[in-house]
């Protein structure tokens, strides 16, 4: 019976050791975090931050809509002016 080569054994052992190491680090980190719990009253309100972000985004959208509306109106006035000017022959 042929023995597995060192390379094939290492391909299995290294990922297995890595997974065990990550699980060990995660367990140690979880036990350290439990002592530093911040009370809910002193934590920033995630919903408040999301609301402020959405308010700023809405203000930006309103500004952009106003700018687009103004730009569209300017372009329409130019087109109307050009159309009116094309109707009248140039006076020389």
Swiss-Prot record:
Keyword Cytoplasm attached: yes
MF terms (GO), sorted A to Z: mRNA 3'-UTR binding
Signal peptide: 1-30
BP term (GO), one: spermatogenesis
Compartments in which it is found: Secreted; Cytoplasm, Perinuclear region
Chain segments annotated as coiled-coil in the UniProt record: none
Sorted UniProt keywords: Cytoplasm, RNA-binding, Secreted, Signal
Any one GO CC term of the record: perinuclear region of cytoplasm
Domain of life: Eukaryota
Similarity comment text for this entry: Belongs to the NICOL family.
Known function: mRNA-binding protein which interacts with a range of target mRNAs and may promote extracellular matrix production. May function as a component of lumicrine signaling and may play a crucial role in epididymal-mediated sperm maturation and male fertility.
Protein name per its UniProtKB record: NELL2-interacting cell ontogeny regulator 1
Organism: Gallus gallus
């Amino acid at each position: 019976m042929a023995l597995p080569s060192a390379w094939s054994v290492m391909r299995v052992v290294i990922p297995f050791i890595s997974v065990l190491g990550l699980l060990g680090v995660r367990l140690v980190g979880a036990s350290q975090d439990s002592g530093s719990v911040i009370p809910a009253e002193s934590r920033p309100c995630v919903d408040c931050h999301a609301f402020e972000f959405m308010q700023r985004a809405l203000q930006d959208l309103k500004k952009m809509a106003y700018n687009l509306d103004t730009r569209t109106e300017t372009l329409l006035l130019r087109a109307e002016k050009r159309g009116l000017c094309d109707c009248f022959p140039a006076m020389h």
